[in-house]
């Protein structure tokens, strides 16, 4: 037992010896290896991706509970390489960047369909409820699955949200009801319904409402002086609902559909500044979409096919009651139509070929007099091949992209087309050890957003796409030391380049415009550790630790003062970790995430340095199993050290707060 304590001290110290956080690396296993021992090991407690050919992370519902995760933003803090932009509070926008790439380079999918915002290019993940999530998956520099739509492989990284997919064996109604309440006026009811109405048809629905005042206190510091304030104009009313249907078309086929609606009316607090806390901004976001999917497999297993279709509509209504003559008020509307066809051919065990063809149409219009009403046609085609043996996995892919731009009232952006290759490999050098070496390369680009192309004065229709190159080399290792102790470790090093980076420069004294001048280099290391130890019957420890080093610098021109400086909002070091004690009475989780210092500007101006911080939390929970259902209670204390910090400059985050969750399902 003494020896065990020493081991645990070493493990739990990993998140504490570095000055900031990272996240667990646990990609989803989509590789079907014939060595049964490999499959068993990878399934252990949600793997760190021992056999995956690309780095990433997977969190399933069990992981989410074991790590004390409270929302999707909290989950992203636990994933290595992620840079989350968070504007604070329950209603603050939250977007994802990965390994120094901006949010525009990170694709986000919801049940296999890509989410999009062609106006800004970034997706706000705070819109989606963690309570409805089955798993969260982050893949960096490629995908492990060969049978994907072309759009799913068109980003530098992909964050996938998969919702609950229960299909009850009986035909009775199954319900889950939940109530969350917490600090700063936070209350959120959630309800989930699922029923197998026949042997082939399953229906489900869920809905969530969130109300929060978000009036948390904060402190402003100016030299030796401190001012205490409280966030105002920060109220949020948000709700969303979904209807889902699943139909089995026989032994080898299935159809699924989803209808989704989201509505969020919120006040915007603006930046925190001295001597004035007056702000009159508000934003009303609405989003609705319908999507449909079909999958079919041949009886002989040689062929598989799938088709997807989606229509998406969204609107944003911005108001500022203090702007002169309401000149800042604006309304925006976006529409998207999407279709995809894909086929996979598996001539023999271990060898697969896949082809996918996607079409996307996007347009945008607004209430502004300067609106040019832009639209875009996108054609994507991908060809993939995957070869698998018990010790070797090879995956190659080529993506051909065509972007055709137009504008009804002005100059259209430049059209573009490009061929983007990628390659990944995983090799197991010793058959007696669960030790793997992996490497991957991906070339990809992103088209300019509508804001970058068309926003009045600021946009430029002559922009070229940003092109990225990603190179990764890593090792993974898993060891079962006894029937009581398991350990998984992954370590990856990477080198990324971005060219033709889109940056804003002053056109004259009053007007800024977007141009392609930037070059950025990103190099770093990610390490994650996960394990469990059986202390005694019904008593176990689950632990996780992660570290990330990200050196992301300007490489455009050595003669310029910004050359070699760390890019804004990216910490050099970050760590995260959690420990859960599972027991028959009350499960306890201690978790934390920390960042080193960052800069709020690429030029590192005086006064733009953001101090590092460590955010620590405590979760206690218990589940009561009853004859006809299950009842659970959970309590969370967030930022238990009451640290004052900012993720985005001048947007203070909440200090210590609490949240209680009551859940009943039957």
Model features per residue range: what roles?
Residues 35-65:
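N-terminal periplasmic "start-of-domain" segments of outer-membrane beta-barrel proteins
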Residues 73-114:
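Extracytoplasmic beta-strand/coil segments of soluble accessory domains associated
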Residues 130-176:
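A beta-strand signature from Gram-negative outer-membrane beta-barrel systems
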Residues 214-218, 228-241, 246-305, 311-336, ...:
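Flexible loop and strand-edge segments within Gram-negative outer membrane beta-barrel domains
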Residues 302-318, 437-440, 466-523, 528-532, ...:
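Membrane-embedded beta-barrel scaffold of Gram-negative outer-membrane proteins
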Residues 349, 391-394, 492-497, 516-601, ...:
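Gram-negative outer-membrane beta-barrel transporters
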Residues 402-409, 413-416, 427-472, 489, ...:
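Surface-exposed extracellular loop regions of Gram-negative outer-membrane beta-barrel proteins
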Residues 543, 594-601, 609-611, 619-666:
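C-terminal beta-signal and adjacent terminal beta-strands/loops
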